[in-house]
Amino acid sequence: MKIGIDARFYGIAGPGRYTKNIIQHLEKVDKSNNYSVFLCGDNFDSYKPRNKNFKKVLADYKWYSFQEQTGFLVSVLKQKLDLFYVPHFNIPIFYPKKIVTAIPDMTMHTYSTEKGTTLPLWYFNIKKIMYRAVFWWAVLRSYKVVVPSKTVMSEFLEHFKGFDKSKYTLAYEGVDPDFIKKVSSHEKVLKKYGIERKFILSVGSMYEHKNVDGLVSMYEVLKEKYGYEGQLVLVSKKDKFSERMLRRVKERGLEDDVLLLAFRVPESKSDIVVTDEEIIALRSQAEVYVMAAFKEGFSLTALEGMAVGLPATLSDIECHREVYADSVVYFDPNNHEEMAFKVNELLINPKLKDEYIKKGYKQVEKYDWMKTAQITLEVFKEAFEN
């Protein structure tokens, strides 16, 4: 079987992490099929095949673009594939052969994002209509849609009532092995980014549903009510959303207390970006990990922190309850007072903190990219045979 993988996202934020890990582990579990891995110019050199059956194909077409539906489509057709795997929803809509997708969430369907957009409202609404049309077509055209949680599967079944449950396959994500490596340059990293005190950490994008505003408000309560003297460190990609958050932090007079760091993405024009190794160092030195999102599909970053002994406090939402069970402290993401109280409990109670560190290590063991790859490979085989 000849399989194509759309890896143009390779290594970039959430979808890129997923793509990177699924490819690396498919290389380990599949020694018989041949793969064409489509990459952009920015990440072409980042991927180095470790399985002779995996070959790289340059497909320098921007995602969510017109070229994705024209030039990229031609590139894929030239490979004469038996199956095309897209670890997202943005398929070439005119691709005529079998497709398997992996779609991480349905946030644009289940959470109103108008408030958070940086675009003119009329333009945003046009993009939203186009997004939903392509999304629906991707589900329709997919032999199977791989989803990362039961929560996301339930949302698919609710919004696409014309499709049977058999359309979807559950495959939990895992912890990137690169994020469990030990690093020894903690002091150097802290000094580089101006982290002069103890700190609370959060890693992820700054879209409206991530509720980063709520995190900053929580920090203000923690500082004023509980006398917290540490810093809040937010690591995100550099984009319009993080730039807007930086302005809000400055407006509140918190620029010395709330630090915004940008992690590395290929299109970043910044000279100062946080590398993967530095994120490991930050996680190993932080006091507590906090995520206040209103919506998530799997929420991997807290798990990555727990893998190196960082206890987590998370928003009490369905996805988090499913993935993390009793291994984290939960709070109402709409209640900044409660958020601060729960975070402070971990900060001041070493025994409680140690309890959740141990629970975290145990919970991490449940998730493995090798399992994800094996499930995905079985989906490929089923699609090819039917």
PLM region spans:
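Carbohydrate transferase catalytic cores enriched for Leloir-type hexosyltransferases
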Residues: 1-386
